[in-house]
């Protein structure tokens, strides 16, 4: 019986997240280490309800396209459904993968960062 993900890219992502000096990336790595059946799947309407304009939303899982988004946010996630991506971009927000986020989002000063899971 194997332990952990057999997806090599996911393992590398978890390792690089743990090496970051920000507590939020370590927390995301812990969430991604959990079994796939416990991974977060968040719909757009929850992001809309619990965020404000220009927030950074981190989802350690997949973002799904149910609901509408009426303000711009930056959403960082492991993966996105096609309708979710379209709705986020249509509202003026940004879509970013976790791989890209750990390289580009180093400074969170003055920004609200929210970790969302079920």
Swiss-Prot record:
InterPro entries: Ribosomal_eL18/eL18-A/B/_CS, Ribosomal_eL18_arc, Ribosomal_uL15/eL18, Ribosomal_uL15/eL18_sf, Ribosomal_uL15_CS
Residues that span the membrane, as ranges: none
Keywords on record: Ribonucleoprotein, Ribosomal protein
Keyword Ribonucleoprotein applies: yes
NCBIfam families for the chain: PRK04005.1
Family according to the record: Belongs to the eukaryotic ribosomal protein eL18 family.
Protein name: Large ribosomal subunit protein eL18
Organism: Sulfolobus acidocaldarius (strain ATCC 33909 / DSM 639 / JCM 8929 / NBRC 15157 / NCIMB 11770)
Gene: rpl18e
